[in-house]
Regions:
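Solvent-exposed alpha-helical segments and adjacent loops
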Residues: 1-399
Length: 399
């Protein structure tokens, strides 16, 4: 609720997992019931209610003399108008932690210089019956996506208590490892609004016991053996105690031919990793090497204190939006993100929708299917025309 002609920003915070999926441009329906003053003093044609989410503008709603919810208006007071509008929210505007923002801009009727007469108590509000309906969305996402992880802890926070998550710590713990672990669990709890009470903590030697869980691996390159063991799964490798881009496979070489920029991007990533030397602080997202239906995130560095550099990048509001893809390198007050590995999907889509999504994300396959379809149509047309031609010839040659 606000007061005055321009009451300032009215906000509402809400949390959800960031894996919302809506096919096409349908969006998520946000039904807004909003109340504002009635009277001859207000210029309804110029007044409006601006609606945004997470600082992204959605739509301006009109303020009319009579509301669409007239029966509610009569019950409340004849001095107020209750209106209702539905705004479609694009799913890519919805994150883990969200804020709906409403900005009333009331304009009075201009009578003359210094002659405007305004009521003493001008109030506006958003009705508590307003809703945002997420029930028609699917839960589906392409991973790895470190932006999901740093903003909402996804996919680990799918279970608020992290009961489906295991944290893999080094055998030889340092104070920085423990601090990183505690900071990270605090951030997870802040994302869900629930304490992390059911996560599992293991060391690298026992990681096979938690193969059915999503994994967060902590430790420096030297202290955490899983980094060397699992680097290949993220198109990386450990060489001489340093992280490097992995050797190209035959399939990678085929993609390089189709996309000449791929080789340049690989070189750029490798050069940046080499330039970090003993100051590397990095985070890697990948499909769990132990179970293809689960995910893993590795927070590592050249030394244990570099893990805290990664955590500090999470907390920095200026750096946080730059964390994306499946590899993030932090240092010198900046972060650089890349996508170097393969994507995989989590969640569920109906079969037809998933096929459309897959084709939409695989343009080469779509072109191939189109060519095959054209070829089939051409062959069928040729066969039909040939039969018609043969039929005509036979009818002409008949006595």
């Amino acid at each position: 609720q606000g007061n005055g002609l321009v009451p300032g920003l009215l906000t509402l915070n809400f949390r959800t997992a960031p894996d919302l999926f809506v096919w096409g441009n349908a969006g998520v329906p946000l039904k807004i019931r909003y109340r504002y003053p009635a009277g001859t003093w207000i210029n309804f044609s110029e007044s409006r209610l601006d609606v945004s989410i997470n600082n992204s503008y959605l739509r301006s709603l009109p303020l009319t003399k009579t509301g669409m919810v007239q029966q509610v208006k009569d019950i409340i007071s004849p001095d107020f108008v209750m209106n209702e509008q539905t705004v479609r929210v694009p799913p890519y505007y919805v994150f883990g932690q969200n804020q709906l923002q409403f900005y009333y801009d009331l304009r009075p009727v201009k009578v003359g210089e210094c002659q405007d007469v305004l009521p003493n108590n001008i109030q506006e509000s958003i009705d508590p019956d307003s809703t945002i309906d997420l029930s028609k969305t699917e839960r589906f996402a392409s991973l790895p996506n470190l932006a999901f992880f740093v903003n909402s802890g996804y996919p680990f926070t799918r279970m608020a208590d992290l009961s489906d998550t295991a944290i893999v710590l080094p055998d030889q713990l340092t104070s920085q490892d423990i601090e990183t672990y505690l900071d990270l669990m605090g951030m997870m709890g802040d994302s869900t609004g629930f304490p992390v009470v059911r996560s599992t903590v293991v060391t690298a030697n026992s990681v096979d016991q938690v193969s059915g869980k999503d994994l967060i691996v902590l430790g420096s390159i030297a202290n955490q053996p899983l980094i060397t063991k699992w680097a290949d799964n993220s198109k990386l490798r450990v060489e001489g105690g340093h992280l490097r881009v992995g050797m190209t496979s035959p399939l990678d070489r085929v993609y390089t031919v189709l996309d000449p920029n791929a080789a340049q991007e690989r070189d750029r990533v490798d050069n940046l990793l080499v330039s970090q030397g003993d100051n590397l602080a990095a985070m890697i997202g990948l499909q769990s090497p132990l179970n293809s239906s689960h995910s893993a995130v590795i927070i590592t560095g050249s030394s244990p204190d570099k893990l805290l550099t990664v955590i500090n990048a999470f907390r920095n509001r200026e750096l946080n939006p730059s964390i994306q893809g499946d590899l993030m390198i932090a240092g010198a007050g900046r972060v650089t993100s890349f996508r170097i590995g393969n994507e995989y999907s989590v969640g569920y889509l109906p079969a037809l929708t998933k096929l459309r999504w897959w084709l939409g994300n695989s343009p080469l396959i779509l072109i191939l299917f189109t060519l095959i379809g054209v070829l089939i149509v051409a062959l069928v047309a040729y066969w039909l025309l040939r039969r018609l031609a043969m039929g005509r010839l036979q009818s002409r040659s008949a006595p």
